[in-house]
């Protein structure tokens, strides 16, 4: 009887500890801009893209310009994925244990390393699969057709982000449980988290830039190119966790993310429209 009581007490204590150390979900975010403001931002994005496309067309090769535009879109798309439910929780779960100190950060460094390894594995698996499909089915698609198709899709999702068009948003509405840190060592959690997020479609999709990146990988022409495409996006997804090397409180990071939630969506839409417009100018001039 006493052993049962003791086990119950230990279980309750563990649950209480988990509740105390887990950061609650954020429900109050910054407000969206008015319809008029979003419309002006949309027009500005298109005009900026058209201007940038004309400038790049006269100063560099089309292939180099398109590569640069893609790298910007993919890397920033990875950064913007931090505003997903999994982005919030990864910054919270993958933190140094105890009070901030050089020793705590040093002991935590392997967790960041395994987290990055998980993202790398995800890029190899997802990018390799998409690149393989591209090699088999889409290797002969003309560059101009590919760019026009992906740019049109990007414009649609840019309008979606500004609230002027409804686009399909396929995703798996799942994330790693908040109590994950109590099941495995921190470095193991870092690896599992990195792989799950590095696969990109196993959890929530925060930015439709991922769909454009996926399309680029599908039209990349080979396995190596497909891996490189997803790797650029995953680098952007992985880097925000490095904020935990700094002496910042978890609550401060979560509050900052919540405060800029709507702005992240607007940046997302702006870049989709601007980069798509620039890409169209490059292949149509």
Curated annotation (Swiss-Prot):
GO (cellular component) term, any one: plasma membrane
Bilayer topology: Multi-pass membrane protein
Localization terms from the record: Cell membrane
Annotated TM spans: 39-59, 60-80, 119-139, 145-165, 188-208, 212-232, 265-285
Keywords of this entry: Cell membrane, Membrane, Transmembrane, Transmembrane helix
Pathway noted in the entry: One-carbon metabolism; methylamine degradation
Domain of life: Bacteria
Main location (coarse class): membrane
Protein's name according to its UniProt entry: Methylamine utilization protein MauF
Species for this entry: Methylophilus methylotrophus (Bacterium W3A1)
Lineage per the UniProt record: Bacteria, Pseudomonadati, Pseudomonadota, Betaproteobacteria, Nitrosomonadales
Encoding gene (name): mauF
């Amino acid at each position: 009887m006493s052993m049962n009581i003791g086990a119950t007490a230990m279980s309750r204590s563990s649950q209480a500890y988990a509740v105390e150390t887990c950061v609650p979900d954020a429900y109050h975010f910054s407000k969206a801009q008015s319809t008029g403001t979003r419309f002006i931002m949309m027009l500005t994005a298109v005009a900026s893209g058209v201007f940038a496309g004309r400038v790049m067309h006269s100063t560099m090769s089309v292939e180099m310009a398109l590569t640069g535009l893609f790298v910007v879109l993919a890397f920033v798309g990875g950064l913007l994925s931090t505003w997903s439910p999994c982005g919030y929780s990864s910054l919270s779960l993958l933190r140094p244990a105890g009070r901030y100190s050089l020793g705590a950060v040093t002991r935590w460094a392997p967790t960041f390393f395994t987290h990055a390894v998980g993202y790398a594995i995800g890029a190899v698996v997802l990018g390799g699969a998409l690149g393989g499909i591209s090699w088999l089915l889409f290797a002969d698609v003309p560059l101009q057709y590919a760019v026009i198709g992906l740019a049109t899709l990007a414009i649609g999702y840019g309008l979606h982000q500004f609230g002027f068009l409804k686009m399909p948003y396929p995703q798996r509405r799942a994330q790693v449980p908040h109590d994950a840190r109590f099941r495995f060592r921190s470095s193991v959690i870092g690896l599992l988290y990195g792989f799950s997020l590095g696969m990109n479609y196993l959890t929530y999709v925060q930015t439709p830039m991922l769909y454009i990146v996926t399309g680029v990988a599908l039209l990349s022409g080979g396995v190596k190119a497909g891996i490189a495409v997803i790797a650029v996006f995953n680098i952007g997804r992985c880097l925000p966790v490095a904020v935990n090397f700094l002496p910042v409180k978890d609550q401060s990071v979560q509050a900052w993310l919540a405060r800029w939630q709507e702005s992240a969506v607007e940046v997302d839409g702006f870049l989709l429209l601007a980069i798509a417009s620039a890409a169209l100018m490059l292949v149509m001039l």
